[in-house]
């Protein structure tokens, strides 16, 4: 099969013919229909988080099940599935507490990649998916069956960008109606945090970004206010918008140190900062612990929106079908696999909400 292989950090991906092993017990092979370009893929491919090469990235996908291994019960050949990176056993401590994103179990696919080059060289199945390729082999816990009626490019976003942003609001923070919410970063994840806040009934939803274009886009997704952090005093504007109280919730959806450092100063008393974006290895953020303790403020981490994919993805699809969740509008442009480096470059320039590779 064809795949876009990363052989050197920070360099263009290389289109190669690679070999994919047959699915084993509890696994399946999925023919990828669409896979989105996520900033996490770019950060990994740039070497921001280390890792081993060669590797195939891509983790935000949808496709058709073509083969199943022994014991697979949740899906059948021909099903359309959203493919996520969340691999879970269902019975460890993390899973038992309703947090499959923190599953502690090691799987055969974790120990040995199903991917090899034509010369027999092992290729890392990055982010437990490796969907910058025509096919993937994944564990059955990683997929959710959906209708084939949803556009593939739109459906692929449910695998990461949507559940991460929306879920940070609804699952991790559990934002209450009437809350004042600030979302730092108006990219794909940030826009879905905005949508989560809107659906949750937030009183004000403030989108903060360096791009006026993205701020205007955020308003179409539900933001009530926009602040360009390169032109305005964010803390002052947030105080004005919230009648001098500050924000009940601040969601940091980008990986910039300045975004983390500035977020705590936007909080109201008893307010909560939710860390969603992922900085490069070694980046540290500074807080004022005395103020946070005195004001009963909180910091939460949110991985993949604390998602339970078998519950959350069907719920998100229901909101989409009701017209309460925008998916189609998140897709900026579609590309074929051979154009993947062009798609990545556009994301790096800030020219896209989500670019999607279609097969």
Model-derived features: where do they sit?
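Residues located in well-ordered beta-strands
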Residues: 2, 14-19, 31, 62-64, ...
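Glycine-rich beta-strand-centered segment in the early N-terminal region that forms part
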Residues: 21-35, 46-96, 101, 147-149
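Mid-domain Rossmann-like dinucleotide-binding core that forms the NAD(H)/NADP(H) cofactor-binding site
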Residues: 80-81, 141-142, 147-232, 236, ...
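NAD(P)H dinucleotide-binding glycine-rich loop of Rossmann-like/cofactor-binding domains
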Residues: 91-184
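C-terminal hydrophobic helical "lid"/dimerization subdomain
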Residues: 261-265, 269, 310-359
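Glycine-centered, small-residue-biased loops immediately flanking beta-strands
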Residues: 271-272, 297
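Rossmann-fold NAD(P)-binding glycine/threonine-rich loop
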Residues: 278-296, 313
């Amino acid at each position: 099969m064809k795949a876009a292989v990363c052989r050197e950090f920070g360099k263009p991906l290389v289109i190669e013919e690679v070999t994919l092993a047959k699915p084993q017990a509890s696994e399946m092979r999925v023919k990828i229909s669409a896979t989105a370009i996520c900033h996490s893929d770019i950060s990994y491919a740039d070497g921001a988080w280390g890792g081993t090469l060669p590797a195939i990235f891509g983790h935000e996908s949808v496709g058709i099940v073509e083969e199943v291994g022994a014991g697979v019960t949740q899906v059948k050949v021909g099903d359309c599935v959203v493919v996520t990176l969340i691999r879970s056993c269902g019975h460890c401590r993390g899973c038992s507490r309703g947090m499959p994103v923190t599953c502690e179990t090691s799987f055969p696919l974790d120990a040995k990649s199903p991917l090899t080059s034509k010369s027999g060289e092992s290729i890392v199945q990055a982010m437990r998916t490796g969907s910058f390729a025509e096919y993937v082999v994944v564990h059955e816990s990683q997929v959710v069956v959906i209708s084939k009626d949803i556009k593939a490019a739109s459906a692929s976003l449910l695998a990461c960008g949507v559940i991460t942003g929306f879920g940070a609001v609804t699952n991790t923070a559990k934002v209450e109606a009437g809350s004042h919410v600030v979302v730092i970063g108006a990219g794909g994840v940030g826009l879905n945090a905005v949508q989560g806040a809107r659906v949750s009934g937030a009183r004000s939803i403030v989108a903060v970004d360096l791009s006026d274009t993205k701020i205007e886009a955020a308003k179409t997704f539900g933001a009530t206010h926009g602040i360009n952090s390169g032109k305005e005093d964010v803390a002052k504007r947030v105080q004005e918008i919230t009648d001098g109280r500050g924000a009940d919730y601040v969601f940091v959806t980008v990986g910039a140190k300045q975004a983390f450092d500035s977020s705590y100063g936007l909080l109201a008393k008893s307010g909560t900062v939710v860390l969603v974006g992922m900085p490069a290895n070694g980046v540290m953020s500074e807080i004022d612990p005395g103020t946070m303790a005195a004001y009963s403020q909180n910091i939460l981490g949110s991985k993949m929106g604390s998602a339970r994919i078998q519950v959350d993805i069907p719920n998100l699809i229901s909101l989409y079908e009701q017209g309460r969740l925008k998916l189609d509008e998140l897709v900026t442009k579609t590309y074929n696999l051979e154009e993947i480096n062009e798609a990545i470059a556009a994301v790096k320039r800030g020219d896209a909400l989500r670019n999607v590779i279609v097969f």
